[in-house]
Structure formats: C-alpha cells, structure tokens
Amino acid sequence: MKVFVAGATGALGRPLIKQLVEHGHEVTGMTRSESKRELLRELGARPAVADALDPDGVARAVAEAEPDVIVHQLTAIGEFNPRHFERDFAATNRLRTEGTDHLLAAGRAVGVKRFVAQSFAPWAYERTGGMVKSEDDPLDSSPPGQVRTTLEAIKYLERAVTGADWTEGIALRYGGFYGPGTSIGLSPLGDQIEMIRARKFPLAGKGTGVWSFIHIEDAASATVEAIEHGTRGVYNIVDDKPAPVSEWLPELAKAVGAKPPRRVPLFLARLFGGELVVVMMSELRGSSNTKAKRELGWKPRYPSWRDGFARGLG
C-alpha cells in the first residue's frame, strides 16, 4: 500500500517508516523541515515538506502522494515540566486539533481507506474504579487543570478520526514511550533518564499510580498492524504489565545505573509540581492491551517493561 506518514521524523515516525518499508509498503514521510529530507530518504521514504498547520500545503503533499492510508503522528513535545504543561503542549494541541482537521480533509479529497492517528493513554482515563482500563472505559471528566486543554485536544482528535464515516478511522492510545529516541532512552540520553540519574525524579507518597508503557519499536509494530488491517475505533497500545510507580521507578533507576529514587511526601510533590504530579504518582490508571492483541494479532517484543528497561533502552 501507499502510506503517508505525518510526523515522520519523530521518535515513533522513524521506526514506523523502517517497519513499513520492511513490510513492502511505499512510504511518503511528511516533515516541515527541508533539512530532514535526506533522513527520510535514508529511512526509505519519499520526503514531502509541508507545515501541518497549513491546510493548502498539507493538501498538496497528500494529493501528490496519493496514499491508501494516512498516519497522523504529529506532535511537538519538548522537555516535560508539569508546572508549565499547558504551555509546553500548546503546539501539540494545535496539531491534534487543526492538524487533524487538515489531514482528514486532505485524506478525504484523495479517498484514503484508513486514517490512523496517535492518541494517548497514560493519564487519560477516569481515575475511579479498577486500576487497569479498557477502551470501553470513560476518559477523565475532571482532569487536573494543568492537562485539561491537552485532554480536550486528545478527545477532539479521537472524535474526529473515529467519526469520519468515509474512511476507517483508528485512534491508537499509546502508553508511555521508552527506548531509543524517547525521553526514557539511552541513545540519545533522554531527559527523564537524566532526571533519574540526578535523583530529580522522586517517588512521591506510596507511588500507587499505575502506568502503562510501550517500547517504541513495539509501538511501531502495532501501528503497522493497524495500518494493514485495523478497524474503526480506539486501541490501547501498551505492554502486558501495567505497574505502580513504586514498582517501575526503582527498577528503571537500577537499569540506568542510578541510585534509588528519593522519597518525598505528596504535599511536597504538590508544592513543587502541582496537582498533576500527585495524580501521576498516586491516582493514574493503567491500560489493557487485550483488544489490540485480539483484533490486530499484535504481540509486543517486550511484553513487560521489566525486560524492556533491562534490554531495550538503546
């Protein structure tokens, strides 16, 4: 198939293109930077330069590629600072709203049969009831103020994509990325790894918040499966082992040669990081990958973050 990947040079876009090429697909990779043309060629993709917030430029790039499938992996996420979360995610929120609209319009004009978009699982689900959520569970109706606009952008993307009745619209709720090129990776050194080594990523309270992770290569392989035979709807793309912070954070510190994380009370975490840090440390729900494994026939290379942290950080 002809596959058009927007956000092609990001942490997920790069391994995704490699895997698509290995599967025999003809890939066009969209970037807004002229300087990344050669990188896309090296990955095996035909480069297309366009700004995702320019509807005419996106339309031209998609029309020229004539894809069967569009993959929306657009983000613009910098260094994570919970105190300035909305500011830091403002550009990504525009890509999840305006950028989504532009890609959908361009895809409709050429009649793509599938439209696969990046969504997000880690702090999106309602923080009540069971500790592991499926795609049928509701998203958070009262998120911390720091992420309210970002969660609304995620909800907008999912509604727009899965509600497009002219194509097979698929939203992939990825877990927390780790591995090469991510913030939890060693090549290059990710900012969260730097924080852990500097003991600036403490364990707050009892660390009962449950996180779901996914290795970046496994995220790419699940995306390939969705591109090839996914059906309309939402899929959690996470590993098999949701885990509380009290379990995974010390293991990650050990894996990267750091001292055990400091422990701080929740009131200090709230004071320095705001309500979001308290939620992430004590209230998050994990995600189930049962649907993705059943319907996509997908099996992660790293079923557990334990193995991934030990062998897959890069």
What are these regions (language model features)?
Residues 2, 15-18, 220-276:
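Mid/C-terminal beta-alpha module of Rossmann-like enzyme folds, strongest
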Residues 3-25:
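N-terminal Rossmann NAD(P)H-binding glycine-rich loop of SDR-like oxidoreductase domains
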Residues 32-98, 102:
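NAD(P)H-binding glycine-rich loop region in Rossmannoid oxidoreductase-like domains
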Residues 80, 84-146:
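Conserved Rossmann-fold NAD(P)-dependent oxidoreductase catalytic core, especially the SDR/UDP-sugar
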Residues 114, 119-120, 156-180:
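Conserved beta-loop-beta element that borders a ligand/cofactor-binding pocket
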Residues 127-129, 155, 167, 178-191, ...:
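Glycine/proline-rich active-site loop of Rossmann-fold NAD(P)-dependent oxidoreductases
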Residues 140-146, 188-214:
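A conserved pocket-lining segment of Rossmann-fold NAD(P)-dependent short-chain dehydrogenase/reductase
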Residues 303-314:
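Amphipathic terminal alpha-helices
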